Amino acid sequence: MHKALALVAFTALAFPLILIGQTSNVALPQDKGPNKIDVSTYPAAQQQGYKVFTEKCAKCHTIARPINTSMTKEEWERYVKRMMHKPNSGISDSQGKTIFEFVAYDQANRKDKNPSAFFKSLSDEEIEKLKAAQH
């Protein structure tokens, strides 16, 4: 009973704080959110960035995951670099730069205007606990 309560408490606290880029076999709350956004009002470079973003990022996880996650510019830079170095990501340096520029623009122009609608990132340790709880 105590273990179950601890798990419920952890889940409730962790729910709004999510990290993208984990393996696709881990279900995260933001995976259930919208899986696309309307970028028709974004500058042409960002519309092209969205295409690269959806093509490359969908190889390893849902597109909903990064669309529904909110991070600082520095966190986005770190996580895009991290994803670039994952085996079989197929993300070149120029594509990584394009993806980063898109997610940074999207963060500033969509997410930062409504921060309570998006999930924050978790630490690696918190993600491991979440993975363990799902198995």
Segments and roles (model prediction):
Residues 19-25:
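Signal peptide processing junction and immediate N-terminal pro/mature segment
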Residues 54-64, 99, 103:
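The canonical Cys-X-X-Cys-His
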Residues 68-80, 85-91, 96-99:
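Amphipathic, hydrophobic secondary-structure cores in small proteins
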